[in-house]
Amino acid sequence: MEHLILVGIGGAVGAMLRFELSKLRPVRSIPLGTALVNIIGSSLFGCVVFSRSPGDIFYLVDVGILGGFTTFSTFSFETFRMFEEQDYQTMVLNISINLIGSLIGVLLSFILVTLILTGG
């Protein structure tokens, strides 16, 4: 039950943060708010996992806050809208920014946490 409460509190915080960031205006038809929440969320998720944080931190931050903060469904919907509008160049750019940006964020979090934990 304790984990459920941590996830619920974290999820509410993450959803509110995402709501605020989603107000950012698109840049060249790219939904910047969605890309930012996914890249930032993936990076922070990696930091918590790679640092082997205690279970309560994992449930509160990764499952709760970052689960409520990141949004694959909005990314998918926005990308589909670009497809419907036959804006294929923007669609591919949006996919690339979200996926590659998120993967780079995880990689950088791995490098950062490894350097911190090894003192190097």
UniProtKB/Swiss-Prot annotation:
TM region positions: 30-50, 57-77, 97-117
Localization per Swiss-Prot or TrEMBL: Cell membrane
One annotated Gene Ontology cellular component of this protein: plasma membrane
Keyword Membrane: yes
Predominant cellular place of this UniProt entry's protein: membrane
Topology in membrane: Multi-pass membrane protein
Reaction(s) catalysed (UniProt annotation): fluoride(in) = fluoride(out)
Activity regulation field: Na(+) is not transported, but it plays an essential structural role and its presence is essential for fluoride channel function.
One MF annotation (Gene Ontology) recorded for this entry: fluoride channel activity
InterPro entries: FluC
GO biological process, one term: cellular detoxification of fluoride
Signal peptide start and end residues: none
Keywords per UniProt: Cell membrane, Ion channel, Ion transport, Membrane, Metal-binding, Sodium, Transmembrane, Transmembrane helix, Transport
Residues binding Na(+), per UniProt: 67, 70
Function statement: Fluoride-specific ion channel. Important for reducing fluoride concentration in the cell, thus reducing its toxicity.
Family: Belongs to the fluoride channel Fluc/FEX (TC 1.A.43) family.
Protein name: Fluoride-specific ion channel FluC 2
Organism: Methanospirillum hungatei JF-1 (strain ATCC 27890 / DSM 864 / NBRC 100397 / JF-1)
Gene giving rise to this polypeptide: fluC2
